[in-house]
UniProtKB/Swiss-Prot annotation:
Identification of the protein by name: Deoxyuridine 5'-triphosphate nucleotidohydrolase
Keywords assigned: Hydrolase, Magnesium, Metal-binding, Nucleotide metabolism
UniProt EC number: 3.6.1.23
Catalytic activity: dUTP + H2O = dUMP + diphosphate + H(+)
Biological processes annotated in GO: dUMP biosynthetic process; dUTP catabolic process
UniProt cofactor(s): Mg(2+)
InterPro entries: dUTPase, dUTPase-like, dUTPase-like_sf, dUTPase_trimeric
NCBIfam families recorded: dut, PRK00601.1
UniProt source species: Geobacter sulfurreducens (strain ATCC 51573 / DSM 12127 / PCA)
Presence of keyword Metal-binding: yes
UniProt-recorded Gene Ontology molecular function terms: dUTP diphosphatase activity; magnesium ion binding
Length: 149
């Protein structure tokens, strides 16, 4: 496992909120909490940017992926609009979570509620080579379910 030392800074009123943390010894993602001043009511079909009150500094070659929490999706229909969201290593602003309510009922985001998870991953930067043709493969250009069920 490659080490990844991440610097974190509280940038809002979140000193009463826990820093992101792993909830089990083998969890891949750290839970992020909502740093809202008042309850945020999300009606069915609505979306909102939920502040977390934190900013991070990642080492070069790493990204942070913001992902949904499965329990919120299953129980309430809460999802992330851009999943996963990507935090680049040069971004220093507050991490925000864009959520949408796909459920049938209003959903209330309360201060300190765990709303998403953050997974750290190394990445590579590709170099593109402009060519006239691509190598042939058995699959070819088949996509979008062409292999059946």
């Amino acid at each position: 496992m490659q080490p990844c030392l991440v610097k974190i800074r509280r940038i809002r009123s979140g000193s009463d909120l826990p820093l992101p943390r792993y909830m089990t010894p083998h969890a891949a993602g750290m839970d992020l909490c909502a740093d809202v001043d008042a309850d945020l009511v999300l009606e069915p079909g609505e979306r909102a940017l939920v502040p977390t009150g934190i900013a991070i500094a990642l080492p070069d070659g790493f990204e942070a992926q913001i992902r949904p929490r499965s329990g919120l999706a299953l129980k309430h229909g809460i999802a992330l609009v851009n999943s996963p969201g990507t935090i680049d290593p040069d971004y220093r602003g507050e991490i925000g979570v864009i959520i949408v309510n796909h459920g049938a009922d209003a959903f209330v985001v309360r201060r300190g509620e765990r709303i998403a998870q953050m997974v750290f991953a190394p990445f590579v930067r590709a170099e593109l080579l402009d060519v006239d043709e691509l190598d042939e493969t058995a699959r070819g250009d088949g996509g979008f379910g062409h292999t059946g069920r």
